[in-house]
Amino acid sequence: MTDTFFKASRMGKVVYPVTEMLDEAYLLEPPEFEGHWDPHVWNDINAWSKAAEAVLLAFCEQDPDHCDRYKENAKAYQKRLELLDKYVHKTMASIPKEKRILITAHDAFNYFGRAYDVEGVGIQGLTTESEAGIEDIN
């Protein structure tokens, strides 16, 4: 993903890698990708709300004439995210903790697991470039 950002930047595109705009204490760094943040922050609604603030700042920087409108939209969006977060917490609480296991092909739900107390198992790992074997599923 970093390469994509660099290429776009070299082509004159404005690039704002959202995870780099968030507080590092909030981000997850997978051991197999030391030095790189897990980019799947949208799977934690609170993290995505923080990302919306980062996007708001980027929009206001690029288009200051419409900053007030961006702020209104961000505030409304964050309110919807807050309601969604409450719903997910309530729904997840209805599942016994020992049964909260999310098995996926691609290990993209670490933020979701942390936010909602769910064990995530990605049989392919964090990247879609690896292959899952039968031993990973058993």
Enumerate the language-model features and the residues they cover.
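Extracytoplasmic metal-acquisition and chelation regions
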Residues: M1-N138
